C-alpha cells in the first residue's frame, strides 16, 4: 500500500517578493531557509516548506544539480508537493503508471532523496518527494 506522509511544500506566486516575505515572516513567524530574487523557501514546521515564487519567475524549466524542475506559473497552475516514504518510491512509480499518469520530470537531490513531478487534471504541478529535499532545521 502506498501512503502520503505529509505535505512537504506548497507554492504560491507573488508580485512583490519583499512585501510577501515580510508578510509571511511577520504574520506567521515563518523563517526563510533559502532563496533569491526569483523565489524564497520558508520553513513552516520541521517538515513543511512554503514557497514564494516571483510571478513570471518560473515560466522556464529550472536546471538544478540533480535534474530539471518543470515550469509552473501563476496563470492557474500551482505547484505543491507531498512527502512519501523513500521505501515506497517504486510503488508510487507503479501506481502512477497504473493510472496512466505521465511523469514529467525526476530530480535526484542526493542519495535516496528524490522528487518526481506530474500534472493534475487542471495542469497543476504535483511533486512526490522522499524525505530530505529541504533542510528544515
Where are each of the predicted segments found?
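Glyoxalase I/VOC metalloenzyme domain signal
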Residues: 1-7, 14-33, 44-103, 119-137
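Short, small/polar residue-rich loop motifs at catalytic or cofactor-binding pockets
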Residues: 36, 111-113
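Specificity-determining recognition surfaces
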Residues: 106-108
